[in-house]
Each structure stands twice: as C-alpha cells, then as structure tokens.
Design a protein with these regions (language model features):
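Short beta-strand scaffold segments in enzyme catalytic cores
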Residues: 1-2
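Single, function-defining residue in the core of a domain
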Residues: 6-172
C-alpha cells in the first residue's frame, strides 16, 4: 500500500507501507513525510487533507504544531465534547445540531486532546446513507460549503492514490 502526498495534482512523496521491513506505521510515514516537506524541502503548503484512518490525535496535534490547517473526517465512534466541559464526552453520531451549527460547524474538544485545544466540526451529508463528521483546526472556518469543497478535493486525491496503489501492485 502507498501513502502519497500531492502538490498541484502531482505526486511529491510516497512511502510503501511495509511494517515487516521498516517497523513503521502509516502514521509514522505521514509524520516523516510532513517533516520532510516542512524542514527539508521547504515546500510551501498550508493545508493537510486526511482520511479517517489518519485522523488520530497524535497526527492532528502534530499538524497543528506545524501551524498547518487540517481537514479530516472522524470515525463515528470518536468521543467529543461540545459542552465546553459541562457534560461528559459523547459519540459524534449522537451530537445534536442546530440549523446554525449545520451551516457554520460547531466547536468541540476531541477526547484525548489537551484541555485548551478545540476543533471545528462539520456534519457533511455525503449521500442518503452516509454522513461524515469533518474536523478542522481552523476555528474561523464557518461554511459548510467550503468544507464540502475541501472534502471533494480530498476525495479526488484519494481516488488518485487508489489508482496509483493498484498500478504499483500490478508492477510488482
């Protein structure tokens, strides 16, 4: 399996996921690619788009520490708090959404994040049988339309990654 980074629709870095040989997880590969992009290649970018499998606290907090914006759908079993500490954590799927929050997103704390670290969460209807809960560390982002556009870009990148992974597997 490949993990890829794209810049203007071109591949700029990839890693072959082979933990038996290198002992690295997919998260380790992504973090190493980010380190390379920021500190070695000095590639200018400001946003990281990720799939749910990469939306782990360690990686989201690392991206935030780089002063980069992230967008990632969270798994529906993630626990979040939208009460600012007044209530216990709830499953994302059980959150209640006002009409305003459906348009503008809502501020939540993800369980395991530092006490003062919040994200903006958007409820994105993907299809009649699928809803994504997309988190971003850009707390000023207040448009479901912008979030949906970002999600479409992420999906196009995902399609390219799937194609390239299939192609690489046929070459071996």
């Amino acid at each position: 399996m490949l993990t890829l980074k794209h810049y203007n629709a071109g591949v700029i870095d990839y890693r072959i996921f082979n933990p038996e040989n290198d002992g690295l997880s997919k998260i380790d590969h992504v973090k190493n690619m980010l380190i390379s992009l920021v500190y070695q290649r000095n590639l200018p970018f400001d946003t990281v788009l990720m799939d749910t499998w990469y939306a782990v606290n360690k990686l989201m907090l690392y991206i935030d520490s780089l002063d980069k914006t992230f967008y990632c759908p969270l798994k529906i079993n993630r626990l979040v708090d939208d009460s600012f500490g007044k209530e216990k954590y709830n499953n994302i799927k059980s959150l209640e959404w006002s009409n305003e929050e459906l348009e503008d997103g809502k501020i939540v704390k993800i369980k395991g994040f530092p006490a003062n670290k919040k994200v903006k969460l958007f409820r994105v209807i993907v299809s009649t049988d699928r809803t994504d809960y997309v988190a971003t560390n850009d707390l000023s982002q207040s448009s479901i339309d912008v979030t949906q556009k970002v999600c479409k870009i992420r999906w196009k990148i995902e399609e390219l990654c799937l194609f390239e992974a299939r192609f690489a597997n046929t070459e071996n």
